Amino acid sequence: MFGPSPPCRSLSGRISLNFVSRVGTLLAEHPHIVAPSLSSLGLSTERPLVLVDVDEVLGLFMQGFGDFLVGHGLEMRIDRFALFQNIYRPGASEHLEVAEGRKLFDAFFAGHCHEIEPAPGGIEALIRLAKSAEILILSNAPAEAERLRTQWLRQHGLPHPLILNSGPKGPIAAGLVAQTAQKSAFVDDLLPNLDSVKDHSPATATFQHVADLRLRPFAPTSERHPRIDDWAELADAIEAAIRS
């Protein structure tokens, strides 16, 4: 989703956090550095690999963050495809200062990101896809979100490893995909991330999904990446893309 990007970290229950700390940043600065090994994350290289975002893909971030803002006397107005520029004081004509929005963003992820609702059909689709593919959750979120984001995944029946990335997702996605000869797919709501993955890993099938109904009319699209906002249809498309 929108907002600042933290250092890359992984929470899989199978690998030391120190091993993957700052991997995303290092990959961006030093392209020769490899991503965490799939085996160390508990993933097989003998099955297709599906990389999936969380905010506005698996989870309704804008809805949850909006509820959080109400508790702070603010409101979220969805009138553009943006984050901080949609935060207002009630009755105000100008959005909240971005610096203040960032503080609230960090506070939300530090203490409330596990409260977001799942995107309709997303959990069921991942459970279905996991029968024939390896699933890895690749999310740009502050480092403070590690524990609660993993808790959110587990409470919804998703045991898959989580990597918190920094910046564009192409470098780390390419490093992960390069470890398997099987087909791969990537799902995100943001075109910069989708373009980054397609640029770094052209063979990876990329799909755009925007979960929040209010955001969909404002979300830019690209012919490079099929836009599929229904998770059942998206799961069909992913299965077709990774089928041997």
PLM region descriptions:
Residues P161-G167, R224-E233:
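Short acidic-hydrophobic, aromatic-tinged amphipathic segments that line or gate anion-handling sites
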Residues S44-T45, K131-S132, V177-K183:
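Glycine-rich phosphate-binding loop signature in dinucleotide/nucleotide-binding domains
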Residues Y88-G121:
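Metal-dependent phosphoesterase signature
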Residues P142-A185, P192-K198:
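Substrate-recognition "cap/lid" segment bordering the active-site pocket of phosphatases
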Residues P171-G175, L215-E223, A237-E239:
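Short, charged, surface-exposed secondary-structure boundary motifs
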Residues C113, E117-P118, G122-W152, I163-N165:
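Substrate-recognition element of Asp-dependent hydrolases with the DxDx(T/V) motif
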Residues F186-D229:
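Acidic, Mg2+-coordinating phosphoryl-transfer loop and its flanking beta/alpha structural elements
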